[in-house]
C-alpha cells in the first residue's frame, strides 16, 4: 500500500512533460542508478571482504567487513518527494548483509502525515488547471473561428489577437497532452520497449517549452501593440512583421540555444532536470525578460493614459475613446504578466504553493479571460454576430411579410437616412483600433 502511495506521489510530482509512462520512467531511472552502481563497484577493490558490494534494486552498497555498518542517504531516485532527509543502513554479518534499517519508508519520511495532504493538494491543482485549460481551449477556438469567419474583423489588431489565441491554444494542448501521457492508467505497461526512447520524451519537452515561451512573448506583443498605439505616429500595422518575429521568432532562437546547451552540458534523461545552471537560465531568462518588459509597458501605458485623460485638451469623443481604451488596458495588461512579477524575483522553492496556484490554476483560465475580453465582449464582434443572426432570421420561412413591412416602413425615411450617412465621417484610426470592449 505504501509503495503505491510513493509511486503515485512520484508521478504527480513529475510536472515536466514526458512521453514515457511515469511507471516506466520510474523503472528507467532505477536502471540508470543500477548502471552507475555497477560502474562504481567495478572500480573499487573489494580485497576479499566478507560482504561484497551489491545493488539491492534501490540503493548501492559498497563492500564491507564483518561487523561494519554501512550508512547511505535515502535513494536519489526518490528525492522528488522526500518529506525529510534521512539515512538507511545495513550491517555486514557472517551470514552476509542484514536487512535494511531503519524501515525504508519511515527513514525517508514517506509516512509523514504531510504527504497525504500534499498528494491531495496536487490532485486538486491538477483537476482545477485541467478544467481551466479545457475551457480556455474551447473558448479560444470559438473566438478564433469567429474572427476568421467575418471579413470585417480582419485587421492588424485582430491578427495579433489570433496569434495570441493560437499561443494559448498550443499551451493548453501541450499541457493536456502531457497529462494524458503522464497520468494515463489504462493499458498494460510494456516498459521493456521503452528504455532508450528518450528522443520522443525530449521532443515533447521541447514542444512544451516552446509553447510556454511563445505564449509569454505574444503577451509581450499585445503590450507592445497597445503602447505603440498610444505613442507612435505611423499606423502600428506596419510593425506586424516585427510582431511575428518577436512572438514566434525569439522563442525559436531561445529554444534552439537551450537544445544546444542541453546536448553539450546536460544531455541526461528527458531534459527535465536542472543540475546544470546554464541550460536552466537559457530557458528561464528570456521569459523573465518578457515579464519585466511587459510590466514596464504596463506602467508606461497607465502613465500615458492618465496624462491623456487628465489633459484639458482632450474632450468629448476623444475622451470617451481614451476612457474605453483605459478600461480595456487596465483589464488586459495585468493579465499579461503583472502577477508573474510577484514570483519572478523569487528563487525556486520559495512560496512554491502560492506559485503553483498562480501559474497553474489562475494561469490555466487566462486563455478564457483573454478570449472573453478580446472577442466575446468586443463591440465589433457583437455587431457582426447580431448582423449575421438577423440575416439568418430573415431567411427563415414566414419572414417575407416582415421584410416587406420593414421595407415599407423604412422607405419614408430613406432620404433623410441617406443624408445622415453622407454627412457622417469615417471613424478615426485610433477609435477603430482601440474598440476592444
Swiss-Prot record:
This is Vasoactive intestinal polypeptide receptor 2. Belongs to the G-protein coupled receptor 2 family. The lineage of its organism: Eukaryota, Metazoa, Chordata, Craniata, Vertebrata. SMART domains: HormR. It comes from the Eukaryota. GO terms for biological process: adenylate cyclase-activating G protein-coupled receptor signaling pathway; adenylate cyclase-modulating G protein-coupled receptor signaling pathway; cell surface receptor signaling pathway; negative regulation of smooth muscle cell proliferation. It comes from Rattus norvegicus (Rat). Disulfide bonds join 37-60, 51-92, 74-108, 201-270. It is found in: Cell membrane. Interacts with ADCYAP1/PACAP (via N-terminal extracellular domain); activated by PACAP27 and CAPAC38 neuropeptides. Interacts with VIP; the interaction results in VIPR1 activation. Residues 23-123, 180-202, 261-279, 346-353 are extracellular. G protein-coupled receptor activated by the neuropeptides vasoactive intestinal peptide (VIP) and pituitary adenylate cyclase-activating polypeptide (ADCYAP1/PACAP). Binds VIP and both PACAP27 and PACAP38 bioactive peptides with the order of ligand affinity of VIP = PACAP38 > PACAP27. Ligand binding causes a conformation change that triggers signaling via guanine nucleotide-binding proteins (G proteins) and modulates the activity of downstream effectors. Activates cAMP-dependent pathway. May be coupled to phospholipase C. Its main location: membrane. Residues 150-157, 228-238, 304-324, 378-437 are cytoplasmic.
